[in-house]
Regions:
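Noncatalytic, solvent-exposed loop/strand surfaces
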Residues: 1-198
């Protein structure tokens, strides 16, 4: 992972700490600010290469969607955006897009988990690669806060968790960890650590 990249919510080591040296102790928003861009939402931005990416709601009313947007890190201009629908969800509009996207250090591809439990895979240029509706396939249910888990990239896997109330071997309300192949989106495994969802 190149120094300076922050490919997922808690950084390259998943501990919330930067390896960068010489960072300022206080931000000067008047003298050293390079750019500012209106964005909104609750997602934590990630940095991969010369892109700053985050999720947020886009549109209003019947046109409300979730969006993954990547900005040019040098200028703040929109490099690309990808929108997808939020359905089968009781998440109110102001709580959409809480989770952060994650970038695969090996490919630069971006993975996002929407509030309605939709997983989307995008190329580093914002092209749609695949998607899976965990809500439809595993009866994942949403809460007032939506899905707040950011995808974890582990080797060839994209791992998400969801509270599900499914049937068959995954029956009963529980938290499940669902591992998807990062290239195809195929389900590799579903883990059920036990216990009731909170």
């Amino acid at each position: 992972i190149p120094l300076g990249d922050w490919p997922e919510l808690r950084g390259p080591q998943r501990d919330g700490m930067s390896r960068e040296a010489g960072l300022p102790e206080k931000l000067d928003l008047t003298g050293s600010l390079l750019w500012r861009a209106p964005f909104g939402g609750r997602s934590t931005p990630i940095v991969v290469g010369n892109r700053v990416c985050a999720q947020n709601p886009a549109g209003h009313g019947a046109d409300l969607q979730e969006r993954v947007m990547c900005l040019d890190a040098n200028t703040g201009k929109v490099a690309w955006e990808y929108r997808f629908n939020n359905f089968q969800s009781d998440v109110p509009p102001h709580r959409l897009a809480w989770s952060s996207p994650s970038a695969d250090p090996a490919t630069g591809n971006i993975y996002a988990l929407g509030s309605g439990a939709m997983v989307v895979a995008l190329s580093k240029d914002g092209k749609h690669l695949w998607h899976r509706s965990i809500g439809e396939e595993f009866a994942a249910f949403t809460t007032h806060g939506g899905r707040t888990m950011s995808p974890v990239i582990d080797g060839d896997l994209v791992i998400i968790n969801a509270a599900v109330s499914n049937w068959g071997e995954h029956s009963g309300r529980a938290i499940r960890y669902i591992a998807l192949n990062k290239t195809s989106g195929d389900v590799v495994y579903v883990a059920n650590p036990g216990g009731r969802p909170y």
